[in-house]
């Protein structure tokens, strides 16, 4: 069986390294390119020196040449970089797995438009467990009667630049949709000072940043006399890497369209 040629954007970052390590462990995948931005100190070094995997792929900033020999680009970078890579992938017909978070509504529209020509998986979290969490939240939000206050608490490492996390926002979207609410109108991002009593229809978000926390997410449904907490805790980035590569395999059966991990895992 011919292995899939996988290019990795942001290859020297925490997620990039985890993805390259996971590719090296798979018989049906091959690292075709390790990509970074111009000026990155690791350019021209062998990617294997960063991951302890077999040598053979030099870290490059030449996206056009690298992607010409790739089936799929896996991208966990920043919105501006991802959109630049998206334009190149669209031109070359290369599929994309996008784990980047922090996109504006307008930027998401650009991705949707590109999906008319190439197949894309866009997901704020590639973990199997987190995507099962989304389904559990939908069930809980529909089943619980009125009178349960909803709070979402997330924690990540000190280097994460966006808040709340894309996963936390997706949790809020799932709950709001299940209860026929508009998240933009009911979301409360942090509280400070004399806030007054809590409005019953709001969904609160709390953010923690510190240390090397990979990712913790909790949805709290607080009623009178009881509370329900649904939590996911990631202990290794390998779980996100494995999910991203599962998404890459899924994309090889699609020519175009925008998908998420619910599609990949058959949960929809």
From Swiss-Prot:
Its EC number is 1.17.1.8. PROSITE patterns: DAPB. The active site is at 156 (proton donor/acceptor), 160 (proton donor). It is found in: Cytoplasm. It is an enzyme of class 1 (oxidoreductase). GO terms for biological process: diaminopimelate biosynthetic process; lysine biosynthetic process via diaminopimelate. GO terms for cellular component: cytosol. It catalyses: (S)-2,3,4,5-tetrahydrodipicolinate + NAD(+) + H2O = (2S,4S)-4-hydroxy-2,3,4,5-tetrahydrodipicolinate + NADH + H(+); (S)-2,3,4,5-tetrahydrodipicolinate + NADP(+) + H2O = (2S,4S)-4-hydroxy-2,3,4,5-tetrahydrodipicolinate + NADPH + H(+). GO terms for molecular function: 4-hydroxy-tetrahydrodipicolinate reductase; NAD binding; NADP binding; oxidoreductase activity, acting on CH or CH2 groups, NAD or NADP as acceptor. Gene3D superfamilies: Dihydrodipicolinate Reductase, domain 2, NAD(P)-binding Rossmann-like Domain. Pathway: Amino-acid biosynthesis; L-lysine biosynthesis via DAP pathway; (S)-tetrahydrodipicolinate from L-aspartate: step 4/4. Its main location: cytoplasm. Keywords: Amino-acid biosynthesis, Cytoplasm, Diaminopimelate biosynthesis, Lysine biosynthesis, NAD, NADP, Oxidoreductase. CDD domains: DHDPR_N. NAD(+) binds at residues 10-15, 36, 99-101, 123-126. Pfam families: DapB_C, DapB_N. Belongs to the DapB family. Catalyzes the conversion of 4-hydroxy-tetrahydrodipicolinate (HTPA) to tetrahydrodipicolinate. This is 4-hydroxy-tetrahydrodipicolinate reductase. It comes from Nitrosomonas europaea (strain ATCC 19718 / CIP 103999 / KCTC 2705 / NBRC 14298).
